[in-house]
Amino acid sequence: MKNFYRSMVATWIAVLISTSVIRATEPIDIGSRRELLVDHHLIERLDGVRLELHRPVRREVVFRPDAAWEGNGSGYQSVFQDGDRFRIYYRGGHHPNSKAYKTSRNSWETLCVAESKDGIHWTRPELGIVEFNGSTTNNLILDAAMVSDFGGSPAHTAVFKDSNPDCPPEERYKIVIVGRNPKGLYLMVSGDGLHFKLKSEKPFATEGAFDSQNLMFWDSVGGVYREYHRAFEKGGYKGVRGIMTAVSKTPTSFPKPQWLKYPNATEQALYTNQIQPYFRAPHIFMGFPMRYNDRGWSPSMTKLPGLEERQHRAKQHPRYGTTVTDAAFMTSRDGMTFHRWSEAFIRPGPARQDTWVYGDNFIFWGMVPTKSHLQGAPDEISLYATEGYWEGNATSFRRYTIRMDGFVSVQAPFSGGKLLTKPLKFDGSQLEMNFSTSAAGSVRVEIQDDAGKPVTGFTLADCNEQFGDQLERVVS
């Protein structure tokens, strides 16, 4: 059998990795796929090393939804690469409880789209689909009138490009949208991602609250559609905000949903879920939920920016002024049980205008590869998050970047350490490793037999010392 193990192991100092492939216990068959060490699924033991969550780098504001039909209520964005361009779908309009809405009265029951060639510079296409103030020269693709038959809410949507190879071309693009008649999640379809129609008058999900961004995608590994939506633990709108899921072979009908599980995690109100297959390792599901934290009024709360607007929102409901939000990170191998990190993936950051508000750090659903700002460096992953939700006249779309596969790493101190995997079965002829060391750090790899003894020719002594910073170094 040829030996192949592709692992994401990033360390900035030194780590020794002991990889076990043949042991008495049943091995985990990883084939020839890329594996990320985002959890303990493949790890038997850590000696002197630890798993560390990495946070993306805050970059520039790439877009502001400040057109007359847009505003500070823009949210529930979806982003994906579509051929040679990128698309962001987002809610337009002002938040109905904001000061700006009192004067403009532009409804947030709209869906807009922006496009980009590089994921950094975004423009509004002039589509001629929806009329606003007597003109169709805008980037609107949906308004409330277009979905009134089923009480659809363009303010609560998720848009995706269906990767199911059997999907009809005229239904390649899909919108998950909340409807009221009857209450549930509905599916809209399109062949171009701009002109959508209702797929079925019957909702595909009816058990849940749905007052959030609810989503669906094709799981290419499992060969099923997965849907994730908002629900409350006590039913209706009572209790802690949580996430339910269901799977189906068809996107138009799902069985009774089940609650996600988070072993060893503290209870946390999760406002969104943003779950998706990781595009470089689609057997791993990643979620970036927005965490909802009502901190109440305190001297510290009054020290945060935007006190006047915070107090204005609190007059409508106290939590509108006292809730602050950030983004978390979680992963799953089965789409149901998630390892959720307690630390924030994106924090509110330095206290400044349009930060530390309810809806801040809402990560868009989706991630895309973009060029590094360093010439000659490999591509990075770009994520996007909202700032300034329901403040001022518009939100801001902030870009964040993170290393390819670099969400979590195995990290060691200068004194070094070891990682021993569980028994593995794999195919291939070489090992590739995503890693980073200091100028003084290094990595070595060893293969052991079922007794924990090094396999001749694959010992630490046989492995050349690896140092540097590369995404796909072939270990020799």
For every predicted segment, state its role.
Residues 1, 24-476:
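Carbohydrate-active catalytic/glycan-binding domains of CAZyme proteins
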Residues 4-5:
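Aromatic (phenylalanine/tyrosine) cluster motif
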Residues 8-19:
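Bacterial N-terminal signal peptides
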